[in-house]
């Protein structure tokens, strides 16, 4: 299908290029591929799972799509979906941990299973403000990336992470109402080869009005050591239980790349995919 898309781009006049039109014609082309026994990627048939935070409601909105509007069946409890599973008809809203699995059903059979997991904490699906700006190449969906309940893999270009270059991550969460909290975490990526280091400090401030903040926690973390394997790392701080509506989280970037690095003294990246409050 990618070869077909490339041909469409190459041979179509700019004024006539239309992705929706291409998708409508694609099923007939795929039928020819199958009839002639061509081997082609099957993931074009898979279900696309779109998860959008609804911060004012504290919920996630889940929508399923296929390129050809195929029938979709899904589960939210981690069980394997089949044609007896619920039929998708409209956007689904959730406010707790779910394991989403979905298949598209067509005359030739079911697609592969598409899967996503949403993990909730007190910060998940809540309004968030970025007080510092991510690097322009790694902003993606901005602050909502940090509270969407979706953890990233080791691909920092996937859109599941946002990256700060030589700048601390400073964000303010609105829990929408005062809640008792006693710990905060940030989940970061470690990939020293690409100058991506973890946080070296985590500070937490709380407020009732969103204007006057007081610090309730501050902890330092060592600079990542040479030879550290590529991984994600959850750094957290705990503090005496306090009631607050607004929480400011400051994750400090590694000040500069260490002497053992191939670019000693240069700025470091800080990549974060999720923040959490308990």
Predicted regions and their residues:
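Conserved, mostly hydrophobic/aromatic
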Residues: 3
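Beta-strand-rich recognition/accessory modules
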Residues: 8-9
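Short, compositionally stereotyped local motifs that mark structural "simplifiers"
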Residues: 13, 17-172, 189, 198
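Short proline/glycine- and polar residue-rich coil/turn motifs
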Residues: 94, 223-230
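Short, surface-exposed secondary-structure junctions/capping segments
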Residues: 129-138, 229-240
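Residues that form or immediately flank small-molecule/cofactor binding pockets and catalytic motifs
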Residues: 133, 209, 221
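Aromatic, loop-rich ligand-recognition surfaces of beta-strand-rich domains
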Residues: 154-217, 231-278
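Solvent-exposed serine/threonine-rich low-complexity stretches and specific carbohydrate-binding patches
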Residues: 215-225
């Amino acid at each position: 299908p990618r070869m077909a898309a490339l041909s469409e781009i190459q041979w179509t006049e700019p004024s006539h290029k239309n992705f929706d039109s291409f998708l409508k014609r694609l099923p007939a082309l795929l039928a020819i591929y199958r009839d002639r026994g061509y081997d082609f990627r099957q993931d074009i048939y898979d279900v696309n799972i779109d998860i959008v935070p609804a911060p004012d409601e504290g919920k996630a909105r889940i929508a399923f799509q296929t390129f050809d509007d195929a029938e979709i069946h899904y589960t939210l409890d981690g069980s394997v979906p089949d044609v007896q599973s619920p039929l998708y008809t409209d956007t689904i809203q959730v406010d707790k941990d779910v394991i989403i699995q979905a298949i598209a059903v067509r005359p030739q059979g079911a697609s592969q299973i598409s899967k996503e997991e949403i993990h909730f904490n007190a910060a998940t699906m809540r309004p968030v403000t970025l007080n510092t700006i991510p690097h322009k190449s790694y902003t993606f969906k901005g602050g909502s990336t940090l509270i969407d309940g979706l953890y990233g893999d080791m691909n920092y270009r996937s859109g599941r992470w946002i990256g700060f270059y030589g700048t601390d991550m400073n964000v303010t969460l609105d829990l929408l109402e005062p809640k008792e909290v006693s710990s905060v975490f940030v989940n970061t990526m470690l990939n020293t080869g690409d100058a991506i280091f973890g946080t070296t400090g985590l500070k937490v401030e709380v407020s009732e009005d969103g204007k006057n903040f007081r610090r309730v926690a501050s902890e330092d973390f060592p600079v990542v050591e040479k030879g550290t394997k590529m991984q994600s790392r959850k750094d957290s701080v705990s503090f005496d239980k306090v009631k607050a509506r607004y929480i400011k989280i400051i994750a400090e970037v590694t000040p500069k790349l260490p002497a053992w690095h191939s670019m000693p003294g240069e700025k470091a990246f800080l990549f974060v995919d999720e923040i959490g409050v308990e």
